[in-house]
């Protein structure tokens, strides 16, 4: 009976030790995987910076701002004209309409 209890205890301890070793091995794999991920992300960033030349980015930004200016200039002018008309009507003393007859 003691022999059976010792064998069961030995099997339990060995399985727990094996689980602990597997857990520790999994942690190092996660660390390795994370470091490889960061390295690939860094390499991708470097490649992207090499491909996208600063002059290209500046040209794209200039084109965007020119396009925005072309679209917004008429709108701003029209809004300014409407605002001035509104203010001039508000400030000019016009005759009030006669009250409606009862």
Swiss-Prot record:
Plasma. GO terms for cellular component: chylomicron; extracellular space; high-density lipoprotein particle; spherical high-density lipoprotein particle; very-low-density lipoprotein particle. Keywords: Cleavage on pair of basic residues, HDL, Lipid transport, Oxidation, Secreted, Signal, Transport. SUPFAM superfamilies: Apolipoprotein A-II. GO terms for biological process: animal organ regeneration; cellular response to lipoprotein particle stimulus; cholesterol efflux; cholesterol homeostasis; cholesterol metabolic process; cholesterol transport; diacylglycerol catabolic process; high-density lipoprotein particle assembly. Disulfide bonds: none annotated. May stabilize HDL (high density lipoprotein) structure by its association with lipids, and affect the HDL metabolism. Monomer. Interacts with NAXE and NDRG1. This is Apolipoprotein A-II. It comes from Rattus norvegicus.
